């Protein structure tokens, strides 16, 4: 029995059969069931995923914990996760998302525990890099994917950008814009988010070749616009950096503080949120380094689904999304 023969029996195309047997694409549930029934009846031996699906027909409940409240960057991460879940709904996959605000370990732990209590089969989480979160994730009997930022736990994979590389790209841009001399203030969300700290490490590494450019401050804003405004307003009252590099969210609030200061400060950002694009259009942010948030959400759900049904892990346990520089007139 071949894919072509299954397609003929099901009255559909070979491409549709391939998508069903390989868990790709959004196929009508009735048609997907008909294809799987034919494959099972004819003892077709497809790839490992299809064998598992035919054998078990199990429902898959995936949980996700994301600090998206008040942080528009994560809107695209959530859209990606929901999009993939819809595509996999034909295979009995459901997705439950717990949205939290900020970087409080107790809040994150509570959200994860609630999902586990609801009986999720797998968990995707943007984890805080603190001992209590690591210990909890390590203790779970279900597969875990870390999304957007990573920590040292036994997980199926990390899905997100290479933050160190992102920081180095920012450092390259700083060198180009400051012409070899200047003072820089970096703004991160939290020292408990490894990705934010990796960006700062990458920035410092890139600037090692230009010793007259210094990173004089690393400010925390909890990825919150109000906190960002207050922190930068206080800092700028006593300091005048040549450049501010945002390495996380809270950019809208931080920009308000910079503009209110009246000081001539150049700005680099990360991500492509509405606020960042608006300030770029106005010429107030020179460039931003993006990281494909939609793909992060999409891949996190896909990786967990594949692992549950086939046991496959991504190579080296990493699924990296692309870091790209975007300027005002980028397409």
What are these regions (language model features)?
Residues 1-54:
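N-terminal helix-turn-helix DNA-binding module of bacterial transcription factors
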Residues 207, 292-331:
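Hinge/cleft segment of the Venus flytrap/periplasmic-binding protein
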Residues 48-107:
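Amphipathic helical "hinge" segments at domain boundaries
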Residues 128-165, 273-281:
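Flexible loop/hinge segments that line or gate small-molecule binding clefts
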Residues 158-184, 228-229, 274-276, 292-309:
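Hydrophobic alpha-helical segments within soluble ligand-binding/sensing domains
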Residues 86-107, 185-186, 204-226:
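Short beta-strand elements in bilobed, periplasmic/extracellular small-molecule ligand-binding domains
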């Amino acid at each position: 029995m071949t894919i072509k023969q299954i397609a003929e029996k099901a009255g559909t195309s070979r491409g549709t059969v391939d998508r069903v047997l390989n868990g790709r694409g959004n196929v009508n549930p009735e048609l997907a069931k008909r294809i799987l029934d034919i494959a099972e009846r004819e003892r077709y031996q497809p790839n490992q995923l299809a064998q598992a699906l035919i054998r078990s027909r199990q429902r898959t409940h995936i949980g996700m914990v994301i600090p998206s409240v008040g942080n528009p960057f994560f809107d695209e991460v959530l859209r990606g996760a929901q999009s993939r879940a819809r595509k996999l709904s034909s295979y009995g996959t459901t997705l439950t998302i717990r949205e939290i605000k900020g970087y409080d370990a107790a809040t994150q732990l509570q959200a994860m525990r609630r999902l586990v209590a609801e009986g999720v089969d797998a968990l995707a989480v943007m984890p805080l890099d603190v001992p209590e979160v690591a210990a909890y994730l390590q203790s779970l009997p279900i597969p875990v994917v870390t999304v957007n930022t990573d920590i040292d736990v036994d997980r199926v994979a990390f899905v997100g950008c290479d933050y160190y590389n992102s920081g180095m790209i920012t450092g390259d841009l700083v060198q180009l814009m400051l012409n070899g001399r200047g003072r820089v203030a970096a703004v991160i969300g939290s020292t408990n988010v490894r990705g934010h700290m990796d960006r700062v490490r990458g920035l410092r590494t890139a600037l090692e070749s230009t010793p007259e450019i210094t990173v004089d401050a690393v400010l925390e804003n909890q990825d919150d616009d109000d906190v960002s405004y207050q922190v930068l307003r206080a800092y700028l009252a006593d300091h005048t950096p040549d450049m501010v590099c945002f390495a996380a969210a809270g950019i809208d609030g931080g920009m308000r503080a910079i503009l209110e200061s009246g000081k001539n400060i150049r700005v680099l950002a990360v991500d492509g949120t509405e606020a960042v694009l608006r300030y770029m259009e106005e010429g107030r942010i020179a460039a931003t380094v993006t990281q494909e948030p939609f793909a992060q959400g999409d891949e996190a759900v896909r990786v967990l689904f594949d692992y549950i049904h086939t046991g496959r892990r991504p190579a080296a346990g990493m699924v990296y999304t692309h870091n790209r520089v975007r300027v005002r007139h980028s397409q």
